[in-house]
UniProtKB/Swiss-Prot annotation:
The gene is URA3. Belongs to the OMP decarboxylase family. This is Orotidine 5'-phosphate decarboxylase. It catalyses: orotidine 5'-phosphate + H(+) = UMP + CO2. GO terms for molecular function: orotate phosphoribosyltransferase activity; orotidine-5'-phosphate decarboxylase activity. It holds the Pfam family OMPdecase.
Length: 263
């Protein structure tokens, strides 16, 4: 039996997850906007439009050509407060613990200072979780959360089978910091006391794929296999699309699909 976001907001071990579930319930949204744009202006304008409809904004901050901390991150944080969404930097860390620790807290982007959530590959082993958690606790007193990449939506992905199983085992190493997975299906864990959040990319109401190997599934399909949050990018703001209309369209579709699995 599926549990409501409100119930999970009251019981989750992670303060980040509790806050996220509470926002989802309040805004009646399980929509994460994937804003892969190249300029600060585009990023901020898009999120100002999409903000009312989303619970989470997913960034690739290293593709912003004119990035500055004060000019990009500070206004982004203001928008997240204005519209009440969390920020997920899709960094996909994949190195030894000591290296990812520096990548997360330092450099130009200083991700641990501002991103509520980030993610990592499991290929390195559990040391990556330890390194990232150390960086988070040393950098800020604000709670942070980590998603592990268990399954991907791209054609030919090798993230399945044994790889996925081992990634789930890594996630078990830290119940508070690891809040869930990027995945296409539920990763279980309930019997062992885990309440993992499943965020699913490759969701489209109109498209089935692209020329670079992305494969799309419908909103109802991904909720039937265990998702909690749908990640949508070009469906919200691609060529000829109005972010205001599409934001509400995807928000409504995601919420209705969630309501259906509760029945």
């Amino acid at each position: 039996m599926a549990r409501s976001y409100a119930e999970r907001a009251n019981t989750h071990q992670s303060p980040v997850a509790r806050r996220l579930f509470a926002l989802m319930e309040q805004k009646q949204s399980n929509l994460c906007a994937s804003v892969d744009v190249r300029t600060t202006k585009e990023l901020l304008e898009l999120l100002d439009k999409l903000g009312p409809f989303i619970c989470l904004a997913k960034t690739h901050i290293d593709i912003i050509d004119d990035f500055t901390y004060d000019g990009t991150i500070l206004p982004l944080l203001e928008l997240s407060k204005k519209h009440k969404f969390l920020i997920f930097e899709d960094r996909k860390f994949a190195d030894i613990g000591n290296t990812v620790k520096h990548q997360y807290q330092g450099g130009v982007y200083k991700i641990a200072q501002w991103a509520d959530i980030t993610n990592a590959h499991g290929v390195i082993g559990s040391g990556i979780v330890k390194g990232l958690k150390e960086a988070a606790t040393e950098t800020t007193d604000q709670p942070r959360g980590l998603l592990m990449l268990a399954e991907l939506s791209s054609k030919g992905s090798i993230a399945h089978g044994k790889y996925t199983e081992e990634t789930v085992e890594i996630a078990k190493s830290d119940k508070e910091f690891v809040i869930g997975f990027i995945a296409q299906n539920s990763m279980g864990g309930q019997d062992e006391g885990f309440d993992w959040i499943i965020m699913t990319p490759g969701v489209g109401l109109d498209d089935t794929g692209d020329a670079l190997g992305q494969q799309y599934r419908t909103v109802s399909q991904v909720f039937s296999t265990g998702t909690d949050i749908i990640i949508v990018g070009r469906g919200l703001f691609g060529k000829g699309r109005d972010p205001l209309k599409e934001g509400e369209r995807y928000r409504k579709a995601g919420w209705e699909a969630y309501q259906n699995i509760l029945r």
